[in-house]
Structures are given as structure tokens and as C-alpha cells.
Amino acid sequence: MKNVSPSYLKHHFLIAMPHMADPNFAHTLTYIVEHTANGAMGLVVNRPQELNLADILEQLRPDIDPPALCQHVPIFIGGPVQTDRGFVLHPAGKTFQATVELEGDLALSTSQDVLFAIADGVGPAKSVITLGYAGWEAGQLEAELADNAWLTCPYDADILFNTSSELRLEAAARHLGINLSLLTSQAGHA
């Protein structure tokens, strides 16, 4: 008997299908940070919230006025879990107090010093800052994939860092040769 290992989606994007009913994930593009037999963790990368980096810095270091450029650095809703916890996806190279190197020259930092470095102009030139994350229990993401809730797409740094947030979902679908507006959840009958 052939031993088949499961296929995990670490370092991929999840594209929410147009019929996604969960309001936390409708019309989202999610980067999968980790996916194992024990579950998965991802960050929604196309849902900016009202906050910007200046707002966060005012809370973290109230004695220093944030640079004006920080007002133009969006903070994304990374998912519904631990929405007060920050995550910063950025190109690998610079490391901070809590930086994990991911695949494909990508890194994830979770310490405040990365935010200060970005604000002070010495941090990563490109980044996606989120509050919260998306989490799936063992088998949950696999079940959602089997129910056609998601499409999967290989990670592409250009989509994450060089595409405006409102165009990332469509860009990932285009990467697969798909137009999301033409998809349906209904099966056809021949």
C-alpha cells in the first residue's frame, strides 16, 4: 500500500469563493502562515480597517508624535482571533525581537520594534500589518476546502506587496486564470 502524505497549504493564498457566507472571510485573500495536521493559521491581507500605523503608535509610545507618513500605512483585519495582537508580514532580511523566517524570502514579525522601525524609516520597505489572525482546528480547513469554500493559489510576493489591497483578491484569482465574478457554488446538470 502506498503511503500518501497530506498536502498542506503553508505559504499559499486562500481565495474566498464568491458564495462564502462567513462575514469574517467573505471576499478575502488570506496568506497561510502555517498548516499542519494540527490546524492552520493565516492572515487576511486585503481587508484594511479604519486604523493606521499612526493610531497604533499613539497607543504604543504616546510621548512621541508619529511621523506623518504613518497615517498612510494601513492596518488590516488579519482575522477574528486575538484581534488585539499584531502581525507584520515583510520581506526577509531584517530581523526584529520576534521574527520568524517563512518560505520564499518572507518573514513574520510580532514584536513592537518592527512597528517602530517602520515608523522611523529603518524597517522593512514593504510590509502588511494586521491585527488578529485566522485560525483553523485540525481538519477544519481541509473540510472547508472540500466544501469549495476556498480556492488556493501559490504565494506571490508581487500580489502581497506590490498590489493595492482592494485588488489583491482579483489578482490572486487572475494568477490562477480565474474571474471570480464568473464562479458559482451551484453544480451544473448535463
Swiss-Prot record:
Known NCBIfam families for this protein? PRK00228.1-1 (NF001266)
Which InterPro entries does its entry note? AlgH-like
The source's domain of life comes to Bacteria
* Family, as annotated: Belongs to the UPF0301 (AlgH) family.
- Protein name, as recorded: UPF0301 protein Pfl01_5311
| PANTHER family recorded | UNCHARACTERIZED PROTEIN YQGE, UPF0301 PROTEIN YQGE
Q: Name one cellular component (GO) term.
A: cytosol
